[in-house]
């Protein structure tokens, strides 16, 4: 049978994912062990058959973990990967330094291990912190203040229901008029009402736009679940709250998703238009379509440095507030409120973003 476009897209995603896993498994689990063994003079412990065997064992473990067969030790696998990425970066820097400078072998390796361990501990600590970032946006369309709070990439599944409770408590303390979640609220099929129950305690109208992980998990079960917890899901739809019109568009692989979907959504004239779109793409089409503020996520700002450079190679906007070239609108890319995979951040932070919207000249 001929494959549909959706099937091709799914298989392409699977192939790309497992190619990434192959490379990431070697970089995080194998390369640091092989390199440190070589530097210490124990390369005979890691001949190439042993190296290949270790690589294959790691990939098998990851596959079993993703399939749910090793659910109890999945956190160990993913955190080992995060720590391995930190050591990979430190090892690469050390390799480059050895080409340029005379470095004592054993002292150098001790430095690699010490710096890698310190950065790993810092990453684990930083993965638990939540930073509140405030922005002021003025518009002649507004006559009174409105506080909008953005969450993005919370990743319940990778993160626990307890973490969501912490997030909700911080959000409620900010006194928002509305809360928006710009995709990737969950990332695991097994997430249910128990993990998401804290959403019922949000003290303001809450809206969700669909991210890529919601699509992967499956919307047939997820959408009714989050709606039963008081969250309005905006799928190619809008909602008016006073002078604000919130517009949600589903995440898609296509770079033209905003250009295609935005003109089809009914709009109210004179409102301050806020677009919720998960990927930081399509902002020119958004501003051309009358959007005043576009909110995105997806990038995690790289989550664990130096992956921010890899993310930057794919997306030109990865974190922060970007003005429209015409000066008429703004685009904010959240670094994410949670973490995917290891609960670690290096060179980035978990963020709750506040937008204090108000009339021009009012601050």
Give short role names for the model-derived ranges:
Residues 1, 12, 74, 133, ...:
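Context-gated lysine
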Residues 72-77, 98-174, 191-192:
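N-terminal signal-anchor transmembrane helix
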């Amino acid at each position: 049978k001929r494959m549909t476009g959706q099937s091709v897209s799914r298989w392409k995603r699977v192939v790309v994912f497992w190619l990434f896993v192959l490379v990431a498994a070697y970089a995080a689990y194998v390369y640091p062990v092989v390199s440190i063994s070589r530097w210490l003079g124990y390369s005979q412990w890691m001949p190439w058959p042993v190296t290949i065997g270790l690589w294959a064992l790691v990939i098998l473990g990851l596959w079993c973990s993703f399939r749910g067969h090793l659910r109890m030790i999945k956190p160990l696998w993913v955190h080992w990967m995060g720590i391995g990425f930190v050591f990979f970066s430190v090892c690469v820097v050390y390799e480059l330094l050895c080409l340029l400078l005379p470095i004592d072998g054993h002292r150098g390796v001790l430095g690699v291990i010490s710096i890698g361990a310190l950065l790993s501990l810092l990453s684990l600590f930083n993965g638990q912190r939540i930073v509140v970032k405030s922005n002021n946006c003025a518009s002649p369309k507004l006559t009174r203040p409105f506080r909008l709070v953005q969450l993005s990439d919370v990743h319940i599944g990778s993160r626990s229901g307890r973490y969501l409770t912490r997030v909700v408590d911080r959000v409620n303390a900010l006194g928002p008029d509305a809360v928006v979640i710009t995709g990737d609220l969950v990332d695991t099929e097994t997430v249910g009402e128990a993990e998401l129950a804290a959403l019922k305690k949000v003290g303001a109208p809450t809206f969700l736009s669909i991210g890529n992980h919601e699509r992967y998990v499956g919307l047939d079960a997820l959408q009714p679940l989050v709606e039963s917890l008081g969250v309005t899901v905006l799928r190619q739809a809008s909602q008016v709250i006073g002078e604000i019109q919130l517009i949600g568009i589903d995440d898609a692989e296509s770079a033209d998703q905003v250009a295609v979907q935005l003109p089809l959504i009914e709009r109210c004239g004179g409102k301050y238009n806020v677009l919720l779109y998960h990927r930081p793409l399509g902002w020119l089409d958004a501003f051309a379509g009358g959007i005043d503020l576009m909110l995105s996520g997806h990038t995690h700002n790289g989550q664990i440095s130096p992956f921010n450079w890899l993310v930057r190679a794919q997306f030109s906007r990865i974190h922060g507030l970007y003005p429209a070239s015409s000066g008429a609108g703004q685009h904010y890319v959240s670094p994410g409120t949670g973490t995917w995979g290891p609960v670690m951040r290096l060179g980035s932070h978990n963020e709750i973003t506040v937008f204090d919207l108000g009339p021009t000249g009012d601050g």
